[in-house]
């Protein structure tokens, strides 16, 4: 495994990488493998062709670099790939990683998923910061279990939400108005749902999420009826002041954590 974050690198995983919001800055905080807080400067990696010289690498993280494209990726056996906080707008080139199982590209203003549909083994996908209106590349990803998306509408999300393989869903800055909880194909399979700064106008259908054990709701305004939570097997609910009181009043037996 190789972990590059800004101008530093390790062969063990950092405890916490840079924040996705670091895309527009030149220095950022992260936590190294030993637990030390470190300030890193943006790295100058712009090309990934050297990965061809490391055929045995299966885990590669190149966070907080100067990548504007993945077109330089060589065909290789990387399975876990993290390109968070770079300057990417397209995933074109990602198809060179046919064994890819997990892709994290948070903090990139990605608008184009071209090539991702050829990575048929992807189980985990995180695109917090992306603004993609065409999610058709996700149709072929029949093994997708864990997805994070941002700046989508409920209608645009129908392709991933209709996947029967999904178990974990995180949505950030999405417009979910219009019967969101009825938009899933197999809501019973969802174990974790996180909604951050999303627009939501109804909780109708929430009672069908009978496998849900973890719920996070932050930055979601409006008067919403959370009474369905009382019948779900939830273990933990995290909410901010906007919804915490209404959730606590739902009768849920879950531990309700109030976030800032």
Predicted regions and their residues:
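Concave beta-strand-loop units of leucine-rich repeat
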Residues: 2-11, 20, 24-28, 35-46, ...
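Extracellular interaction modules
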Residues: 251
